[in-house]
């Protein structure tokens, strides 16, 4: 409608809202969807523009699509009918029936302390954990209302089903992970090397099955005493014709996860991550029974993509830039390392090393940064329990997600108030990670998009953040 008004959408939004309110008009003129306020003067939802086109929307079976690619030919300020299933705030599939291209607007990037990011307009709502009178509560906040040290909600429920995986796609994912981490593809030549003989043989076999053509393999002893196995491809004609051809001439700092892999099911993404970490990742035991799993790259975008893909498997990581210029994706606590080992893992000998490190560590006591902010204080104040139970609650960490996984029933046995029990159970069931906001910065004027989701909660996932859909464009 803004195309027909000299001052755009904003000038007519309030009128459109009133036209959809049955208490404002005897005969409503607009069939509204979403929050249009109430007769008690509760305000309607703000007009929303949503996220930039690079935001990844999660679909069932581990598929992901950038919101700007749902309807590639969508015109600015247009409504586009779609019929697809996306994941809601709980990780369940729901129907999205409209894609809105809302034109170009000023945008802002919300970045968490771990490095997770989403970019949207100032009036786009994200689900946050807010202290409401001492009660930790899940509420929507507009990006313009979010401040550093607030806590945003990240959805981390892993796919229940990994979806059908075509063998050809699996082999291509394996090759992509291997060549991104320890290979190169120039305009005239390509190569790959690794010290793990079995892993190297697997990569060569995948290359023969997917790409084919003449190639050479060799082995040599290097300074460390290990044997380095090398794959040399001197004619890359066949490689250019495959989807790996996108790597031709790509600088290390420009590497990223291609769209075809984002569109693939979780089973294919898992193989890619296994190959990537086997080539460029590492794991090591640290003092004081700590562990570290890391992946290093010169490409910022690749680090962002790897962190985001691990989040799709429910694995929380930290991303930062090292002093030497490399971007690192890091796991530093036992609970997340165990999830990595079971849900993704390395693709070769490093997996055995990781298993041994985890096996040598004492049982995880749940003391890590994965917690529900404000929950311990709320439970201790409002538990309604006897003094002996209150004393137990004061002496134990009752806000850690891992502790609730291992000792949830024991914690609940010390809480008498049923409402407190219900709130604590809902916040600690593991669906969400409560990430502290590090910054909210301007990101310039960009095209923005939104979906209309046919549920009561009107929520979908963008880069793991829980976003509210648009009521009106």
Curated annotation (Swiss-Prot):
Record keywords, A-Z: ATP-binding, Autocatalytic cleavage, Cytoplasm, DNA-binding, Endonuclease, Hydrolase, Intron homing, Isomerase, Nuclease, Nucleotide-binding, Protein splicing, Topoisomerase
Iron is among the record's keywords: no
Alphabetized Gene3D superfamilies for the sequence: Hedgehog/Intein (Hint) domain, Homing endonucleases, Topoisomerase II, domain 5
InterPro entries: Hint_dom_C, Hint_dom_N, Hint_dom_sf, Homing_endonucl, INTEIN, Intein_C, Intein_endonuc_central, Intein_N
Main enzyme class: isomerase
CDD domains, per database record: Hint (cd00081)
SUPFAM superfamilies reported for this sequence: Hedgehog/intein (Hint) domain, Homing endonucleases, Type II DNA topoisomerase
EC number: 5.6.2.2
PTM characteristics: This protein undergoes a protein self splicing that involves a post-translational excision of the intervening region (intein) followed by peptide ligation.
Active-site residues, Swiss-Prot/TrEMBL: 49
One MF annotation (Gene Ontology) recorded for this entry: ATP binding
Topo IIA-type catalytic domain ranges (all copies): 1-473
DOD-type homing endonuclease domain: residues covered: 175-315
The keyword Signal is assigned to this record: no
GO biological process: DNA topological change; intein-mediated protein splicing; intron homing
Location(s) in or outside the cell: Cytoplasm
Reaction(s) this enzyme catalyzes, per UniProt: ATP-dependent breakage, passage and rejoining of double-stranded DNA
Miscellaneous: Few gyrases are as efficient as E.coli at forming negative supercoils. Not all organisms have 2 type II topoisomerases; in organisms with a single type II topoisomerase this enzyme also has to decatenate newly replicated chromosomes.
Known partners and oligomeric status: Heterotetramer, composed of two GyrA and two GyrB chains. In the heterotetramer, GyrA contains the active site tyrosine that forms a transient covalent intermediate with DNA, while GyrB binds cofactors and catalyzes ATP hydrolysis.
Protein role: A type II topoisomerase that negatively supercoils closed circular double-stranded (ds) DNA in an ATP-dependent manner to modulate DNA topology and maintain chromosomes in an underwound state. Negative supercoiling favors strand separation, and DNA replication, transcription, recombination and repair, all of which involve strand separation. Also able to catalyze the interconversion of other topological isomers of dsDNA rings, including catenanes and knotted rings. Type II topoisomerases break and join 2 DNA strands simultaneously in an ATP-dependent manner.
Stated family: Belongs to the type II topoisomerase GyrA/ParC subunit family.
Entry protein name: DNA gyrase subunit A
Gene coding for it: gyrA
């Amino acid at each position: 409608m803004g195309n027909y008004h000299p001052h755009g959408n904003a000038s007519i939004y309030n009128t459109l809202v009133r036209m959809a309110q049955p208490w404002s008009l005897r005969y409503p003129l607009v069939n509204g969807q979403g929050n249009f306020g109430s007769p008690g003067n509760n305000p309607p939802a703000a007009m929303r523009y949503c996220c930039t086109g690079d935001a990844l929307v999660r679909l069932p079976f581990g598929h992901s699509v950038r919101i700007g690619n749902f309807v590639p030919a969508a015109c600015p300020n247009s409504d586009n009918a779609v019929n697809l299933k996306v994941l809601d705030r709980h990780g369940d599939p729901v129907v999205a029936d409209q894609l809105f291209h809302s034109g170009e607007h000023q945008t802002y990037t919300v970045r968490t302390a771990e490095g997770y990011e989403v970019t949207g307009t100032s009036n786009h709502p994200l689900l946050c954990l807010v202290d409401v009178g001492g009660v930790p509560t899940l509420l929507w906040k507009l990006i313009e209302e979010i401040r550093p040290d607030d806590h945003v909600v990240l959805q981390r429920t892993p796919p229940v089903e990994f979806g059908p995986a075509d063998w050809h796609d699996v082999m291509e994912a394996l090759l992509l992970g291997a060549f991104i981490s320890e290979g190169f593809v120039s305009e005239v030549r390509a190569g790959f090397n690794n010290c793990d003989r079995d892993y190297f043989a697997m990569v060569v076999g995948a290359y023969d099955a997917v790409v084919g053509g003449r190639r050479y393999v060799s082995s040599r002893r290097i300074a460390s005493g290990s044997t380095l196995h090398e794959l040399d491809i001197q004619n890359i004609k066949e490689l250019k014709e495959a989807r790996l051809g996108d790597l031709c001439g790509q600088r290390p700092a420009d590497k990223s996860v291609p769209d075809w892999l984002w569109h693939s099911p979780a089973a294919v993404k898992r193989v890619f991550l296994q190959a990537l970490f086997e080539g460029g990742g590492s794991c090591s035991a640290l003092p004081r029974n700590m562990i570290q799993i890391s992946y290093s790259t010169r490409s910022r975008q690749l680090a962002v993509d790897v962190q985001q893909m691990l989040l799709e498997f429910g694995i929380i990581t930290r991303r930062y830039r090292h002093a030497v210029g490399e971007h690192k994706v890091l796991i530093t606590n036992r609970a997340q390392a165990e999830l990595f080992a079971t849900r993704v893992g390395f693709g070769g000998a490093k997996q055995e090393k990781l298993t041994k490190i985890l096996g040598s560590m004492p049982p995880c006591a749940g003391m890590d940064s994965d917690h529900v902010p404000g929950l311990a204080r709320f439970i201790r104040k409002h538990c309604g329990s006897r003094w002996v139970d209150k004393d137990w609650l004061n002496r134990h960490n009752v806000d850690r997600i891992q502790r609730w996984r291992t000792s949830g029933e024991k914690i609940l046995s010390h809480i008498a108030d049923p409402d407190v029990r219900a709130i604590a159970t809902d916040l600690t069931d593991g669906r969400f990670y409560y990430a502290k906001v590090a910054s909210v910065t301007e990101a310039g004027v960009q095209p923005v998009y939104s979906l209309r989701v046919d549920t009561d909660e009107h929520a979908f996932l963008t880069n793991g953040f829980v976003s509210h859909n648009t009521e009106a464009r």
